[in-house]
C-alpha cells in the first residue's frame, strides 16, 4: 500500500517535513519496484536524509 503525507511508517515521524515527503516519494518508488516494506523503509530513510543534507546545506 503506498504511503501518503498522512499515512507513513512510524519511523518517519521524527524526520523533518521535507525529509519525510522525500522518504514517502522514494519509499513508494521502491515499493513499486517490488521491494518489501521492511527493506524499502530503511533505504528510503537513508536516501531522504542524504537528499536533505545535500539540498539544505548551509
Pin down the residues of each PLM region.
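C-terminal alpha-helical interaction appendages
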Residues: 1-58
Amino acid at each position: 500500500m503506498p504511503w501518503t503525507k498522512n499515512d507513513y511508517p512510524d519511523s518517519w515521524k521524527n524526520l523533518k517535513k521535507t525529509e519525510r515527503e522525500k522518504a514517502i516519494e522514494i519509499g513508494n518508488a521502491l515499493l513499486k519496484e517490488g521491494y518489501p516494506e521492511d527493506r524499502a523503509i530503511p533505504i528510503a530513510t537513508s536516501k531522504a536524509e542524504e537528499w536533505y543534507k545535500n539540498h539544505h546545506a548551509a
